[in-house]
Amino acid sequence: MRNSRRRLLAFVCGMVVSAATAFAAAPGADDSGAALWAGDAQRTMQWVMRHGDHGGRPFAIVDKKQARIHVFEPSGALVGATPVLIGLTRGDRDSVSSFVDRTVASLMPTERTTPAGRFDSEPGHNDKGEAIVWFDYDAALAIHRLRPAPAHERRPQRMASSDPAERRITYGCVVVPEAFYDDVIAPTLGRHRGVVYVLPDEGTSDAMSSSAEMALRAP
């Protein structure tokens, strides 16, 4: 899942401009019943559909600045959106290249990042047999349900917070509410291979560069 195309999208996503535009999604799209998107996620969705970059697969956009996920059908229809928990530390690069001889508990705070980029996702299971969606298997990064964690991390309270900064606590995985996983993730990314686009913490631009588009069209 680590390839030059994904790296290119990490760069491309880093150039997506923030915009003031927001609009309401379909009723029931998230916990509030009307998911408002920031411009970054909207522009990325439009770019994905314009170029067919998802290859006719379900896809998700993780907006790290807002600590939210938006999940789409292959047609581009929004299935749902919700606040998420993401990596403790801001950063857009892979902090850990492989978990060979490493454990999650061994990660330093500076290594607990959710990297930006384009990831080919696939359904799978963790070591406890729980259903998850891998988006970077080599780095042990997945989308999964909110699970029990040390009390001092206050994960349920952080998930409920309206402050995106409060929702930075994980080791790099994207953690969603249990009901959202069951109702939105499981029938889409949990059933089929897909694509996960993780938007960056840093970087702005007003358009996708022509060189990036040419590279995406290259064999």
Predicted regions located by residue number:
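Gly/Pro-biased beta-strand-loop elements
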Residues: 40-58, 62-154
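Soluble non-cytosolic domains of exported or imported proteins
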Residues: 35-39, 56-59, 63, 171-175, ...
